[in-house]
Design a protein with these regions (language model features):
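Periplasmic-binding protein-like
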Residues: 43, 120-127, 194, 198, ...
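Ligand-binding clefts/hinges and TM-proximal coupling segments of bilobed small-molecule sensing domains
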Residues: 23-27, 151-170, 206-211, 238-258
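Flexible hinge/capping segments at coil-to-helix
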Residues: 28-30, 127-144, 231
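C-terminal motif of bacterial Sec signal peptides marking the signal peptidase cleavage site
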Residues: 17-20
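Extracytoplasmic small-molecule ligand-binding "clamshell" domains
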Residues: 31-101, 243
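Acidic, polar ligand-binding/catalytic clefts
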Residues: 75-138, 208-213
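A ligand-binding cleft/hinge motif common to bilobed small-molecule-binding domains
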Residues: 102-110, 155-159, 183-184, 188-215
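Short loop->beta-strand "edge-of-pocket" segments that line small-molecule binding or catalytic clefts
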Residues: 37-41, 137-152
Length: 258
């Protein structure tokens, strides 16, 4: 059973002030807040979230989530699942929030709420060294892999339709599988988040080029529709931006400057 504590709203900004369990709400207007926040992620998206050799989930999003939880005075519990199941987990109240390098697209906003954006990467097409793939036109007639349920899957479909580039699309469960498909020659390229791609490019000696089309939305924290947590998390993100803490996390985890 999850224990409950109360928090006060002060100065128009929600700040969690944990009180003794069972204490009644004050007259200043309080809302119940879980003492344990259940967070969903998909740990196949380094440097945002992945498992280290010890099996622990680490990454930019994990440090960010832990910082947010500390600021709100709550414990964080992380559940690892497939990326394409994260929205459903929010809708079914299995988790309270999701940090998974998730872009705040209009389609997703119909089903969940988002915080303010905390990072924007852009996309890249990754291929084997010496592939000669340098432009969208070079992808004509080839097979391009994407991670299932991601904005890159949506973006690749848009490129096929809007840029009139005819390539076959192959959706896989995670970014690691995409790289294995490239190395084995089963796909010609993978369309990936730029920050994720840069790590694989360095590790595997791969080639890549930037997607020149319209930039995708930035990454944000996702919540169930109507969640009271949105304002609280936005307040923490604003403080992190102001204090430079967000830049510190980017310097620690992200290869490119943001």
């Amino acid at each position: 059973m999850i224990m409950k504590k109360s928090y006060l709203l002060a100065g128009g900004v929600a700040a969690l002030l944990l009180t003794a369990c069972g204490q009644e709400d004050t007259a200043t207007g309080a809302a119940e807040q879980k003492e344990v926040l259940e967070m969903g992620t998909s740990a196949e998206f380094a440097p945002f979230e992945s498992r280290n050799p010890q099996g622990d989930i680490v990454g930019f999003d994990i440090d960010l989530a832990n910082y947010i939880a500390d600021e709100l005075g709550v414990e964080l519990k992380i559940t690892d699942m497939k990326f394409d199941g994260l929205i459903g987990a929010l809708q079914n109240d299995r988790v309270d929030l999701v940090l998974a390098g998730m872009s705040a697209t209009d389609a997703r906003k119909e089903n969940v709420d988002f915080s303010t954006e905390y990072n924007h990467s852009g996309e890249m097409f990754v291929s084997q060294k010496g592939s000669g793939l340098e432009t969208l036109e070079d992808l004509e007639g080839l097979t391009v892999g994407v991670q299932l349920g991601t904005i890159q899957e949506e973006g690749a479909k848009s490129i096929i339709e809007e840029e009139a580039i005819d390539f076959e699309l192959k959706a896989l469960d995670d970014s690691g599988a995409l790289i294995q498909e490239i190395l084995s020659g089963r796909i010609d390229a993978a369309y990936m988040d730029k920050q994720v791609a840069l790590g694989y490019i360095e590790a595997q000696g791969l080639d890549a080029f930037d997607d020149p089309t319209t930039a995708s939305p930035g990454m944000a924290v996702a919540f169930p529709k109507g969640s009271d947590l949105v304002d609280d998390v936005n307040a923490v993100l604003a403080e992190m931006e102001e204090s430079g803490k967000l830049d510190e996390l980017k310097d620690k985890w992200l290869t490119d400057e943001q």
